[in-house]
């Protein structure tokens, strides 16, 4: 589901998997434990339920104070245009050059890949920027955090998450991710913004926490 809700048709399948002794990991907004059938089955068969979007960390509000180290954020013209892929590709290339670098996951799939991180769209809005400050704290002057972007500043549904992520990331640099063949934003009746518009808006909004923010590249998703 586009909004992260658990489809009813999945419940029986999940219960069946539990009966076979499988632990269950879910990236949905709907918590596995909120479904009685799933919760009871997990207890009966002694398996673990992992809700990847949730954790027990109490985040503070963002403070916008300058942190040591360098940060790069991937931003997008829309959802699902390659922000995670780009971030991972950049991290890999920098590691091959023996640079100090870490991928910082902000979505459930990224958390699965990195085995750590935060699903930022499940954080209460007041604490989004603070959660990202926690995720990317002070570091060595020559260390880069490559932060996975979410949504788009131009998406009517998810721009709030994107903006909080931008402010908390305090990026020195950003890469714009874009799918050239896409004409309409995912899930809404809205035209795609131009790459130029995204660069301009990201710089304008990003200056709140880093006056030196700048675009260093464009990543094109040519899979479609």
Regions found by a protein language model. Name each.
Residues 26, 30-32, 40, 49-59, ...:
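Conserved catalytic-core segment of NTP-binding enzymes
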Residues 71, 91-126:
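N-terminal phosphate/diphosphate-binding loop that engages ATP/GTP or pyrophosphate donors
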Residues 23-29, 73-81, 118-122:
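Flexible, glycine/proline-enriched loop segments at strand-loop-helix junctions
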Residues 37-38, 61-64, 85-87, 113-117, ...:
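Short acidic, glycine/serine/threonine-rich loops at helix termini
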Residues 5-10, 80-88, 112, 153-158:
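Short glycine/serine/threonine-rich phosphate/pyrophosphate-binding segments
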């Amino acid at each position: 589901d586009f909004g992260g809700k658990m489809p009813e048709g999945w419940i029986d399948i999940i219960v069946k998997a539990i009966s076979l002794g499988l632990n269950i990991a879910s990236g949905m907004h709907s918590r596995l434990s909120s479904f009685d059938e799933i919760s009871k089955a997990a207890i009966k068969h002694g398996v673990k339920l992992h809700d990847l979007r949730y954790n027990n960390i109490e985040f503070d509000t963002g403070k916008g104070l300058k942190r040591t180290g360098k940060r790069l954020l991937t931003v997008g013209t829309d959802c699902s245009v390659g922000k995670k892929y780009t971030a991972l590709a950049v991290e890999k290339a920098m590691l091959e050059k023996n640079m100090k670098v870490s991928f910082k996951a902000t979505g459930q799939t990224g958390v699965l890949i990195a085995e750590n991180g935060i699903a930022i769209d499940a954080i209460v809005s007041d604490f989004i920027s603070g959660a990202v400050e926690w995720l990317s704290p002070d570091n060595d002057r020559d260390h880069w955090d490559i932060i996975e972007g979410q949504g788009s500043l131009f998406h009517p549904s998810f721009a709030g998450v994107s903006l909080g992520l931008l402010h908390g990331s305090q990026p020195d640099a950003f890469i714009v991710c874009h799918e050239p063949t896409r004409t309409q934003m995912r899930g809404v009746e809205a035209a795609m913004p131009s790459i130029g518009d995204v660069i301009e808006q990201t710089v304008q909004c990003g200056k709140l926490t880093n006056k030196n923010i700048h675009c260093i590249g464009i990543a094109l998703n040519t899979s479609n």
